[in-house]
Amino acid sequence: MHLTELKNTPVSDLVKLGEEQMGLENLARLRKQDIVFAILKQHAKSGEDIFGGGVLEILPDGFGFLRSADSSYLAGPDDIYVSPSQIRRFNLQTGDKIEGKIRPPKEGERYFALLKVDQVNDDKPEVSRSKILFENLTPLHANSRLRMERGNGSTEDLTARILDLASPIGKGQRGLIVAPPKAGKTMLLQNIAQSITHNYPDVELIVLLIDERPEEVTEMQRSVKGEVIASTFDEPATRHVQVAEMVIEKAKRSVEHKKDVVILLDSITRLARAYNTVTPASGKILSGGVDANALHRPKRFFGAARNVEEGGSLTIIATALVDTGSKMDEVIFEEFKGTGNMELHLSRKIAERRVFPAIDFKRSGTRKEDLLTTADELQKMWILRKILNPMDEVDAMEFLIDKLMMAKTNEEFFEVMKRS
């Protein structure tokens, strides 16, 4: 029996399995994690092997637990204990994805324990020992393009195509989506996620939702094929911070194994607010009630995005909230403004006219975009900017959408533009 399979099974099926096949009682009133734990414990009595896996979180005491992505790395009874000797032996770190054989808890124990390590980050455990630490890897400018355009000519693809023209994204990009309320940032993130899973199935995608509404989390889980990790607005700030730390550590471990990872974060403003709440008071308060030391850790999160010379990349596209009426949000945005190497501005004015995507084309852009595009394409993008520059932001967007509708792909659009 495999623990991951049980976690992916709907609760109704788990209750059926436990009550009808294993003779367990009163499962319907338990949390899913408790049901999984009860089924595993019952299964272990029959003497069969049990396999499990998860993402390692090492606690200050030296031992660790394998947390599950399904429960957004929340501590639960179905977590797997990892001993300090195993952590030292395989040079394991927080964020390592581990698979192996597990054993049921003995008398006086509360958790299942890891017996044997079979895989670390989808590689043999021996490979993990010789990898270079993320901090020692050489960061470079993004030079390999992540194209958003799917080429199917749909209205959803229109957003992706405008994104490709306004601010191209590369592997290792550190992007900021600057969004006022109700400008369609969540839909834009969904669109980016769907484009990445469609065009680059080998890229590891993680959508991280901090302080979001529960219904939006469900919608994101159903519309995106990647991993969706969330901490909703009814959770404490410490939980937001723990989730974010787990996600960034997991991404770093994957990059150490030369993989390409993309994190879509909604939103960095709320994450910075959470860090501001949990950071011990330093006595220095900036305007808006932000502690002087509070923004160091969210900056470290955002700053982890990089293209790596030794192979692999970590791309982070985060949304930053503006025009919310909060002085704190303004201060947080100002702090992050110059740190990204790609900015996409959404406009309230365009969204109020019900024109979507509400992208402010003139203010959006990518640094060093010549590394991501061909000289010919770059020339055409500059000509397009010259045409749109004299126009008002709403007119520019409406004009661009009308013209893009005439062609199925951006290449066709440039051909039409050339002829006219």
Curated annotation (Swiss-Prot):
Gene3D superfamilies: 1.10.720.10, Nucleic acid-binding proteins, P-loop containing nucleotide triphosphate hydrolases. SUPFAM superfamilies: Nucleic acid-binding proteins (SSF50249), P-loop containing nucleoside triphosphate hydrolases (SSF52540), Rho N-terminal domain-like (SSF68912). One of its GO terms (biological process) is DNA-templated transcription termination. ATP binds at residues 170-175, 182-187, 213. Residues 49-124 form the Rho RNA-BD domain. One of its GO terms (cellular component) is cytosol. InterPro entries: AAA+_ATPase, ATPase_F1/V1/A1_a/bsu_nucl-bd, CSD, NA-bd_OB-fold, P-loop_NTPase, Rho-like_N, Rho_factor_ATP-bd, Rho_N_sf. Facilitates transcription termination by a mechanism that involves Rho binding to the nascent RNA, activation of Rho's RNA-dependent ATPase activity, and release of the mRNA from the DNA template. Belongs to the Rho family. HAMAP family: Rho. Homohexamer. The homohexamer assembles into an open ring structure. This is Transcription termination factor Rho. It comes from Haemophilus influenzae (strain ATCC 51907 / DSM 11121 / KW20 / Rd).
